[in-house]
Amino acid sequence: MAARPPASLSYRTTGSTCLHPLSQLLGIPLDQVNFVACQLFALSAAFWFRIYLHPGKASPEVRHTLATILGIYFVVFCFGWYAVHLFVLVLMCYGVMVTASVSNIHRYSFFVAMGYLTICHISRIYIFHYGILTTDFSGPLMIVTQKITTLAFQVHDGLGRKAEDLSAEQHRLAVKAKPSLLEYLSYHLNFMSVIAGPCNNFKDYVAFIEGRHIHMKLLEVNWTQRGFQSLPEPSPMGAVIQKLCVTLMSLLLFLTLSKSFPVTFLIDDWFVHKANFLSRLWYLYVVMQAAKPKYYFAWTLADAVHNAAGFGFNGMDTDGKSRWDLLSNLNIWKIETATSFKMYLENWNIQTSTWLKCVCYERVPWYPTVLTFLLSALWHGVYPGYYFTFLTGVPVTLAARAVRNNYRHHFLSSKARKIAYDVVTWAVTQLAVSYTAAPFVMLAVEPTISLYKSVFFFLHIICLLIILFLPIKPHQPQRQSRSPNSVKKKAD
């Protein structure tokens, strides 16, 4: 069982202490103040980057260089000398990129990046005793690991595989030449994503730096105008303002709900020994709902930073309005109204789902669902609670798929039946996610077992019975069209 850090160490920071007076004034841990300050500075820098370093005014080399320098400054401000881990990993993997053969470049990069990340996860927990509440260097290291492995696989696709062996998406994203050192550093360490992500594709990033990003996306959706130079350049301001409003609301909800419904309530003596079964399920749902706004805040703010810089355009919707969701990491409305486990996971931590698809789900020849869950758990860290969550997610995913394939079609014959089905499946989905994700925030073995014992392991038992006794109706779409999000569990 992972040792929990002492309370006095749970919020310590390794970064700058210049905002310590503000931290004391607000009553918010310094590491979190540094994180938010860096993201707000990044937002300001993003506006400046889009206006004053527009591709029409600055060369790609200048944009790459400034994006990298700002990113390095922000990560050092937040994490101090621990930022060296990011620089070491990026430089090591660039060495792999330029020296390894294209037939093995993806394998070597994957094992070096994941190996280094795992060693850092172990050291920060078992040696340095950093708590889960500490905003430390492992977060950026996780994002960099995604980027390193994504790029390595895409270079392998572009240089080491035949075009006919690639799926349509792999062909679109294949990288046909190894990146220069400046491009590599900029892609991994740029100020927009180095603190909070998300992972993005190398071709999209380079197109953004070179000023081809928006035009490329418009041409992908067959935008018909007088020519390439006459294509419009939509403003991201509407999307940025909307996302900043969501960010502010998420922050207020987090500050309110996390204090009213702390995770520790799930191991409280009253909850475990005195509350009735239905009360336990209700409080489990409420506590897990209260834990979500912090993710909404961090991911939506990161999305706004990219959009403010002009990155994240994704074409036009059916009404002809600009879409700025290329790098969005979640869809809050679809999460909160999801009527299936699959739908929920498809809209949570979207870019990590895309990464899992790229490096695991579409690549492995056996047991893609199980191996994707295990990779996701390993990427998150070595707390036992992560593995409880992801291993619980496997039977829940399989059981949900079996129920849907066997019964859903019976409820589509009338509107009333469909509404009833949607209401029931919404309630079951939200409860199943809360049950499955609880160990993720509890971390250790003892509180996880205590929680599951208090609710009699009911979902584990139900899922196993469904898998054992419901007839299997195989659903076998093409490998390239399978979504990893249907097998990916809720991530941090």
UniProtKB/Swiss-Prot annotation:
Substrates-to-products reaction catalysed: a 1-acyl-sn-glycero-3-phosphoethanolamine + an acyl-CoA = a 1,2-diacyl-sn-glycero-3-phosphoethanolamine + CoA; a 1-acyl-sn-glycero-3-phospho-L-serine + an acyl-CoA = a 1,2-diacyl-sn-glycero-3-phospho-L-serine + CoA; a 1-acyl-sn-glycero-3-phosphocholine + an acyl-CoA = a 1,2-diacyl-sn-glycero-3-phosphocholine + CoA; a 1-O-(1Z-alkenyl)-sn-glycero-3-phosphoethanolamine + (9Z)-octadecenoyl-CoA = 1-O-(1Z)-alkenyl-2-(9Z)-octadecenoyl-sn-glycero-3-phosphoethanolamine + CoA
InterPro entries: LPLAT_7/PORCN-like (IPR049941), MBOAT_fam (IPR004299)
Originating species: Mus musculus
Record's protein name: Membrane-bound glycerophospholipid O-acyltransferase 1
Entry annotated with the keyword Transmembrane: yes
Single GO term (MF): 1-acylglycerophosphoserine O-acyltransferase activity
Record-annotated active site: N349, H380
Gene: Mboat1
Residue intervals passing through the bilayer: 33-53, 69-89, 125-145, 179-199, 237-257, 296-316, 370-390, 423-443, 452-472
Enzyme class of the recorded protein, top EC level: transferase
Single GO BP term: phospholipid biosynthetic process
Family recorded in the similarity comment: Belongs to the membrane-bound acyltransferase family.
Chief location: endoplasmic reticulum
Pathway assigned in UniProt: Lipid metabolism; phospholipid metabolism
Location of this chain's protein in the cell: Endoplasmic reticulum membrane
Membrane topology, as annotated: Multi-pass membrane protein
Function: Acyltransferase which catalyzes the transfer of an acyl group from an acyl-CoA towards a lysophospholipid producing a phospholipid and participates in the reacylation step of the phospholipid remodeling pathway also known as the Lands cycle. Acts on lysophosphatidylserine (1-acyl-2-hydroxy-sn-glycero-3-phospho-L-serine or LPS) and lysophosphatidylethanolamine (1-acyl-sn-glycero-3-phosphoethanolamine or LPE), and to a lesser extend lysophosphatidylcholine. Prefers oleoyl-CoA as the acyl donor and 1-oleoyl-LPE as acceptor. May play a role in neurite outgrowth during neuronal differentiation.
Tissue: Highly expressed in stomach, epididymis, and colon.
GO cellular component: endoplasmic reticulum membrane
Chain positions found as Phosphoserine: S486
Keywords from the named record: Acyltransferase, Endoplasmic reticulum, Lipid biosynthesis, Lipid metabolism, Membrane, Phospholipid biosynthesis, Phospholipid metabolism, Phosphoprotein, Transferase, Transmembrane, Transmembrane helix
